[in-house]
């Protein structure tokens, strides 16, 4: 990662030190994608072992660089991970009264119109988000959504993902992908937007709830 700038020097060591210093075994950590550069699951072992070695339970969603995690292989990969790591792909779950749904989303930073391939992926990701949120029972204390891509375009205009967040009365959105440049944080239409890309958070976990 250091090829992307000096800020990334020793990033793995810094993340580990900061994570280990504040996360307790009973905590749950939401990790919003781009876990490994590997193409195949077998080649991602070292990166996944690194995440597994950190304290706490972890919930992972796919990022745009996670080629090792193909959507149709989610169950197979999950079966080979430790119990402390949960792959969340278009599903919803409840942790200590808090509902969590997650999916990758789709690209937003390009000015050109989406082509047919983009439209297909976009519709699928929207369906995953809708499904995941629908699996969260009504009586939860709050609803958190994990996305890799943010739910707005390069002009900071909300897209169809944001509409789903509003319709399901999501309380908190955590997202990644953005490294500098455009971003939205804080109260957006009653939803607390949190950008959690590690270079934005100082390579340290941030408390969500």
Language model segments and positions:
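N-terminal active-site segment of His-dependent metallophosphoesterases
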Residues: 1-57, 67-68, 122-141
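Binuclear metal-dependent phosphoesterase catalytic core
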Residues: 13-17, 94-96, 117-123, 134, ...
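Conserved catalytic scaffold of divalent metal-dependent phosphoesterases
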Residues: 22, 66-156
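Active-site neighborhood of phospho(di)ester-bond hydrolases with catalytic His/Asp-centered motifs
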Residues: 29-34, 58-64, 86-90, 144-147, ...
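Active-site environment of divalent metal-dependent phosphoester hydrolases
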Residues: 36-42, 64-72, 94, 107-111, ...
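Charged helix-capping and loop-helix junction motifs
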Residues: 42-49, 74-78, 156-166
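Short, conserved loop/helix-junction motifs that constitute active-site signature segments
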Residues: 49-55, 81, 163-169, 187-188
